[in-house]
UniProtKB/Swiss-Prot annotation:
It comes from Rickettsia prowazekii (strain Madrid E). PANTHER family: 3-OCTAPRENYL-4-HYDROXYBENZOATE CARBOXY-LYASE-RELATED (PTHR30108), FERULIC ACID DECARBOXYLASE 1 (PTHR30108:SF17). This is Uncharacterized protein RP821. Belongs to the UbiD family. It comes from the Bacteria. GO terms for molecular function: 3-octaprenyl-4-hydroxybenzoate carboxy-lyase activity. GO terms for biological process: ubiquinone biosynthetic process.
Amino acid sequence: MSFRDLPEFLKFLEKNGQLKRISTTVKTDLEITEISRRVLAQGGPALLFENVIKADGSKSTIPVVTNLYASIKRICIGLNLKSPAELRELGALLAFLKQPQIPESFKETLSILPLAKRIFSMSPKTIAKGACHEVVIVKPNINILPIQKCWPEDISPLITWGIVVTKGPTKDRVDHYNLGIYRMQVVSENKLLMRWLKLRGGAEHHKRWKTKKKELFPAAVVIGANPVITLAAVTPIPENVSEYNFAGLLGNKKIELVQCKTIDLKVPAHSEIVLEGYVSLAEYLPEGPFGDHTGYYNDVEEFPIFTVTAITMKKKPIYLSTYTGKPPDEPAILGEALNEIFIPILHQQFPEIVDFWFPPEGCSYRVVVVSIKKSYPGHAKRIMLGIWSYLRQFMYNKFIIVVDDDIDVRNWQEVIWAIATRSDPKRDTSFIDNSPIDYLDFASPKSGLGSKMGIDATDKMYPETNRKWGKKIEMSQEVIDKIDSMWDGLNI
């Protein structure tokens, strides 16, 4: 089932026991975070806070929803998928879009045509009026929004689920519409800080704009959108596909866009709230500290100022929010879903990969365990180097553990057993120095530059070892089958 907008999605979730209304008065300052954190830890529903007190002590006229994507089930519902198993099918589609294979026959060519036609037919549709323009405020005050302060030492309230819409300075494909989710620190009534990492789409547009244009860089921030738009913004979509097109493909319906009121950008017409404005090319301010997905407060660093020129919204909007902290948190759960999407993409490039796992406690991407069908000496190291260099999302990975296909990568007991029995610390550990690292990683020797470690925990073959390799203990299948047939009668 696809949804037109966020309220329609919430209505469906509530009907199916996946949303809980909170009528008790709560504060945006810390209280929403603590309630959301406890419910998420219990595997609970999305939360709709109907009576919210803002940072200035006034009551918000806008309700707040949190934990919306804090379960794989809700993510699948939002992506218009029937089950988590279909996440890999979605990954297979992305793998095809990223690197289409040449058809081997006329029949195969015919089978691909409907998919290609469907992709290109999902270009967004511009309409004259949108629900997000029911209220237009041209003298904007950000403080009308119930923006969360997530952690005690956060320097200010923080917009956490804003979809930032940008375009580059040219008509080249690389400058087409980009959707990205970046946190934004509140600085004043009409100013925010745009915290985007250097290699993200919005930051790349901003960088190219500096070299091509003299005028300010327009950007729009969408808060509360159709779930396929939100999830398209966090999915590893190939650069040759627009997030708007991909969202239309997910929802099986063209995304309706509307022209912004004060800037030359188009945004989803059924958005709850939109902040229009310009990102400065020269003015930067210190951002942070804020609690982050690592479970620590991040360092202070300068980011460009986003000046809001208008706030547009529905008559009765809903404010979508989240928090980030030590896993489990909402980004970690989204990471679990994205993990399933990554597997077919990786398998297309490395067919020997059997399974791939970003443990949530590894802070989204810092630790990965991968199993392979090993077929030659040095195979594990080739996989390490391949993963580190293949996708931009893996650039900041610090630790890769490679195991054989008899090991369940999602079971730490098996992974640790493989490391303990199949690896030698000197022979089977590889290091790479002076490699790109997430600048938020304070454990690295230099900001943005650190090392990577790979552990080969696979069975060894000549010439990796000259010793006789151990034989794995396994019960005979005949005995297993016999005991299976006897089991109920044993009354154990």
